[in-house]
A protein has these predicted regions:
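Short low-complexity stretches enriched in small and charged residues
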Residues: 10-13, 31-39, 119-126, 182-184, ...
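Generic N-terminal amphipathic, Lys/Arg-enriched alpha-helix
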Residues: 11-55
Length: 223
């Protein structure tokens, strides 16, 4: 199937051209953190994650990632997701808008226009789904998944979701260690997210309010 990204204007390539702060060089993006990881780095990271009770699947293309994710989640499951450019770029967010095989809790949350009720719905249903779909800000070669957000909707779900968390990430997220993960976040991810916030919400930028390190999976959780 054709990959459909409903927000092509929010991709890295688009933001580098259209964001006034980035295009004018007022803000400098560290492009080292956009590079695809080497095969050796990918395999080392996979081995480290698996040693820490995570299940890992490596896929070569966006199409493969889309099909794998679609087939991974059992029909009838409740699902939720946070914002993820990766999920957008593989076409999964677009697919969710019309998919009927799952209980899409994220759509139910966004359909609530009252902010207080939406927050309550997010707390009561958003964190109790069977599957929560997300991405990571960085993944270290020694198997640490690093995430951050500004409001707690992503990080909160990582910790509180009653079911399983699925992290979909490109190999450009792989870094050597925690220090490089922090550098990637503050020198790359935050600046691109700030550009997206300026475009999508007319805000001055984003902020790292919550910063999480997942150092291992739950060793007592059933597969």
């Amino acid at each position: 199937m054709a990959i459909v990204n409903n927000h092509p204007e929010e991709t890295r390539e688009a933001l580098l051209k259209t964001d006034p702060k980035i295009s004018s060089k007022e803000v400098v993006i560290d492009d080292r953190y956009a590079a695809v990881a080497s095969e050796a780095s990918i395999q080392a990271t996979k081995a480290s994650l698996e040693a820490k009770s995570h299940e890992v699947t490596i896929l070569e293309t966006k199409e493969e990632a889309f099909e794998f994710l679609k087939n991974l989640i059992p029909k009838g499951s409740s699902i939720n997701n946070g914002h993820s450019t990766t999920l957008e770029e593989i076409g999964f967010i677009s697919y969710l808008k019309t998919a009927t095989e799952w209980d899409n809790v994220h759509a139910q949350i966004l359909a609530e226009t009252d902010f207080a009720k939406q927050s309550e719905l997010r707390r009561l249903k958003g964190f109790t789904v069977d599957y929560y779909l997300s991405s990571a800000s960085a993944i270290t070669e020694d198997g640490i998944i690093v995430g951050c957000d500004g409001t707690g909707t992503r990080i909160g779900a990582w910790y509180a979701t009653g079911g399983k968390v699925i992290i979909v990430a490109g190999t450009n997220k792989i870094v050597k260690n925690e220090q490089e993960a922090s550098e990637r976040i503050y020198k790359y991810t935050l600046e691109l997210e700030s550009a997206r916030m300026r475009l999508a919400y007319k805000l001055p930028g984003s902020a790292v309010v919550n910063y999480a390190l997942i150092k291992g999976g739950n060793p007592y959780s059933p597969k």
